[in-house]
């Protein structure tokens, strides 16, 4: 679609029945498989996209997407990322130097850096893989069917073992065992009468 607004560098291989919309840019040693949909303001650099992949408004650099996976909108694959079959990378997700196994999903607002994720894992909204200690990068491992709840921090190097369950809001600094639920957050407190006391304090406050 719209070849006048699309840039595909010479030598790029594109499979049959693949749709490339306007404003897409494909550079370098890239290959696009069959039956793909590449749309939005997507940029693909030195990357391989297998068959039946959907890319919507994403930046993909020196990475590999396997069959039936999808990414976007507004997502980014930084170098050395490998996205497995049927993996979903949603809006505002960034992946760097990491692998995601078949069926794993990261739907919203996550950073996955220097990590190896297995199959059928759920990465919740706002999850951050904390990979840098100020001097060195460290890797984390998340095994098959683990669940990482929203706003969790995975502080590398740690391992979440098979079917490990990390509760929302937790900061993980130690390994999580298989089938284990980890909750690491302050206990919720109920302070009765606070609002009325605050109103009175505000009323008596003098500028």
Locate the predicted segments by residue.
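Extended, small-residue-rich solenoid/repeat segments and analogous flexible loops
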Residues: 1-70
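Glycine-rich hexapeptide-repeat left-handed beta-helix
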Residues: 55-207
């Amino acid at each position: 679609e719209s070849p006048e607004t699309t840039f595909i560098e010479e030598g790029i291989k594109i499979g049959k029945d693949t749709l490339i919309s306007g404003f897409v840019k494909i550079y370098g040693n890239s290959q696009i498989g069959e039956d793909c949909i590449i749309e939005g303001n997507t940029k693909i650099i030195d990357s391989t996209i297998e068959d039946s992949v959907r890319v919507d408004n994403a930046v993909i650099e020196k990475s590999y997407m396997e069959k039936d996976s999808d990414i976007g909108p507004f997502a980014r694959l930084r170098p050395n990322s490998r996205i497995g079959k049927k993996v979903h990378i949603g809006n505002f997700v960034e992946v760097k130097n990491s692998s995601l196994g078949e069926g794993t999903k990261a739907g919203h607002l996550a950073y996955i850096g220097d990590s190896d994720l297995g199959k059928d894992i759920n990465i919740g909204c706002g999850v951050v893989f904390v990979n840098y200690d100020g001097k060195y990068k460290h890797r984390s491992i998340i095994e098959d069917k683990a669940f990482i709840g929203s706003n969790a921090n995975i502080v590398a190097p740690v391992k979440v073992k098979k079917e490990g369950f990390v509760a929302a809001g937790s900061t993980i600094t130690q390994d999580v065992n298989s089938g284990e639920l980890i909750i690491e957050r302050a206990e919720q407190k109920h302070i009765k009468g606070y609002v009325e006391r605050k109103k009175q304090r505000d009323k008596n406050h003098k500028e």
